[in-house]
């Protein structure tokens, strides 16, 4: 009797792709987040309300939301459109855009589960060689699917009933 199913596959971080819209005030122009970045993960920062009733020995917890953010340290590469967009916002307040998360390990026929979120970008440090920034996800994401052709994603929101 096998304890591990035979169809288990190891996911790679390159299969969880993130794109930033570098033209947020017009038609989306998605650029990959990844050039010059060796490590990045989305922190969910869950909000949990805890309450312990006097008649119980253990507390109750209510997961009320997430405060997602992506903290990035990126080596600077001239002509990388995503870096150029981040760099242009170094001294700007409320520098907003959109972020697209695509799970390419879960797709069928070139269509992948995806989430699009509004976001706020803040630069925390810049040395010329590296730039550090945080992308704060705003509100609930729009669920949908994405296809990727020539490195450019096309997002299609899921229609709700």
Identify the meaning behind each predicted range.
Residues 89-95, 118-122, 152-157:
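Short, low-complexity, polar/charged sequence segments that are solvent-exposed and flexible
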Residues 8, 19-22, 102, 155, ...:
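Extended hydrophobic/Leu-rich segments
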Residues 100-143:
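Short beta-strand and beta-hairpin "edge-sheet" elements
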Residues 2-73, 118-129:
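Solvent-exposed edge beta-strands and adjacent loop segments
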Residues 81-83, 142-145:
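Intrinsically disordered, low-complexity acidic/polar segments
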Residues 59-113:
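Structured, beta-strand-rich domain cores
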């Amino acid at each position: 009797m096998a304890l591990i199913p035979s169809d288990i596959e190891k996911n790679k971080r390159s299969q969880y792709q993130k794109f930033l819209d570098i033209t947020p005030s017009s038609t989306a122009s998605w650029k990959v987040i990844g050039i010059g970045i060796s490590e990045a993960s989305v922190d969910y920062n869950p909000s949990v309300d805890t309450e312990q009733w006097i008649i119980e020995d253990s507390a109750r917890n209510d997961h009320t939301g997430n405060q997602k953010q992506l903290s990035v340290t990126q080596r600077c590469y001239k002509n990388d459109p995503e870096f150029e967009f981040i760099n242009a916002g170094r001294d700007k307040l409320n520098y907003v855009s959109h972020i697209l998360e695509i799970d390419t390990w879960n797709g069928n026929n070139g269509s992948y589960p995806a989430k699009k979120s509004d976001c706020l970008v803040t630069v925390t440090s810049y040395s010329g060689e590296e730039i550090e920034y945080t992308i704060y996800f705003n509100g609930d994401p729009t669920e949908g699917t994405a296809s990727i052709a020539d490195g450019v994603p096309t997002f299609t929101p899921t229609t709700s009933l």
